Regions:
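Low-complexity, Gly/Ser/Thr/Pro-rich intrinsically disordered linker/tail segments
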Residues: 32-47, 392, 396, 400-418
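Conserved beta-strand/loop element in small beta-rich adapter and peptidoglycan-binding domains
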Residues: 63, 160-183, 235-252
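...with weaker cross-activation on analogous glycine-rich loops/strands in unrelated enzymes
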Residues: 170, 333-400
Length: 418
């Protein structure tokens, strides 16, 4: 028999952000759930568009996450930063991959000590002086953020191509960043974004002055992407993801005019104007945080492909829920372990499984439910009184065998993810 699962219920000021950590339960059903319960219409409530949190409360929650260091307020950044702080950020960004030779594979071969040292050394950490000039820049395309300055994948198995240990996250085009350092060969820039630090391709950046940069970092007028993806044609096609913020305004004829980033030959930012029809993929400002908006946004990405760290033009479990809440004005941390720290913990030890499920009944739809290394969005109970979630899942275990799904699905909580 399996050991009793231990739960914790995460309680906070906002009911919409109640969340629970759930460890493995015995598998009783294969993923995913299909049928009516796997549609947005099943969970929408007629007329239920009352905000669960006001825009002010959403902004306050974002500010609290900044105060706790879970996300970054890059708009208040200084012009110079202590070199020691930048060195510490670079080491932290490596997430342990620079401490000892990891047992990983590159191009199907075991990673060698020489290759590992070469990549770590290319960070040129010893060249960082007492103070570093903080340079504002904007990404000009969807851009990988890497733990070390290399675009070669490091994988835990020789034939793996999906779970790159160096892939941190991705940024949308037009994402304001702070450039703090460069790799020895100049190919990579070490940047701080609103939710991450890491190495990006220097050619994906366009440098600009602070005032122009602020128009991307904190635009007064902007649109939010409400579909899984938005592609904008141009010299280089721009791919934006759910929740992305694009500076722009609406013209008198109802058309949407966007400010799009372009890098000139000298590496500087040129703002290109793009015109799009108002076809429902963009909304002015942020959406209100309501039950129905939560449901619509969550289901906008149903069955889209899972992408570890944003690879394959996809999302992973934590960026999926981050993007949903971002579209409604709440900035959450990027990674699941940091998202868990958004709220305080109330242990539920000593309760039976039935009592814990009863406690789950008090959790509102839209709550984030956590398991080790995984986060899900709670939908509620179906007609058969079974709690269901929607999540971007890579795999689960059935009879000890790992089953890969790699997409956004609706499911029960009766699965093992480790």
């Amino acid at each position: 028999s399996m050991p009793e699962p231990s739960y914790t219920l995460r309680a906070g000021i906002a009911a919409a952000f109640l969340a629970a950590i759930l460890t493995a339960l015995p598998v009783r059903a294969a993923l995913p759930v299909t049928g009516a319960a796997a549609t947005a219409d099943y969970w929408l409530r007629a007329g239920d568009d009352v905000p669960l949190l006001s825009a002010e409360a959403c902004a306050a929650l974002t500010h609290a996450n900044m105060q706790r260091g879970l996300i970054h307020d890059i708009t208040t950044a200084e012009e110079f930063r202590a070199g020691d702080m930048v060195r510490a950020q670079i080491h932290a960004a490596a997430q342990g991959q620079d401490v000892a030779l990891p047992a990983l594979y590159e191009s199907g071969q075991p990673l060698t000590e020489q290759r590992w040292r070469e990549v770590c050394d290319s960070r040129a950490i010893e060249e960082i002086g007492a103070h570093v000039s903080v340079r504002p820049a904007v990404t000009v395309r969807r851009t990988d953020v890497r733990l070390l300055p290399s675009d070669a994948g490091w994988f835990s198995a020789p034939h793996d191509v999906r779970y790159d240990a160096l892939q941190g996250t991705v940024t949308d085009p037009g994402e304001a960043v702070l450039v703090l350092h460069g790799s020895r060969d100049g190919r990579y820039a070490f940047v701080e974004t609103r939710d991450y630090c890491g190495w990006v391709d220097e050619r994906a950046l366009a440098f600009t002055d602070r005032e122009t940069w602020r128009g991307f970092a904190a635009p007064e007028e902007f649109f939010t992407v409400t579909t899984a993806q938005l592609r904008i044609a141009g010299e280089e096609q721009l791919l934006y993801q759910l929740g992305a913020k694009i500076p722009g305004r609406r013209s008198s004829d109802g058309a949407i005019h966007l400010s799009l980033p372009v890098r000139d030959a000298g590496g500087h930012l040129v703002v290109r104007k793009g015109r799009l029809p108002d076809d429902g993929r963009l909304v002015e400002g942020r959406l209100p945080l309501t039950h129905n908006n939560l449901v619509r946004l969550a289901f906008s990405s149903l069955y889209t492909e899972y992408g570890w760290g944003g690879a394959n033009e996809g999302m992973d479990c934590s960026s999926y829920v981050q993007n949903i809440y971002r579209a409604m004005g709440v900035e959450l941390p990027r990674d699941a372990d940091m998202q868990e720290r958004v709220r305080s913990l109330l242990p539920l030890a000593g309760l039976s499984t039935a009592e814990r499920y009863e406690r789950l009944a008090q959790v509102p739809p839209g709550a984030l439910l956590f398991r080790p290394g995984h986060v899900m969005l709670y939908l509620g109970r179906d007609a058969g009184n079974t709690p269901l979630v929607i999540h971007d899942i890579s795999s689960y275990y059935e009879d000890g065998v790992q089953q890969y799904i790699r997409q956004v699905v609706v499911s029960t909580l009766d699965f093992k993810n480790s």
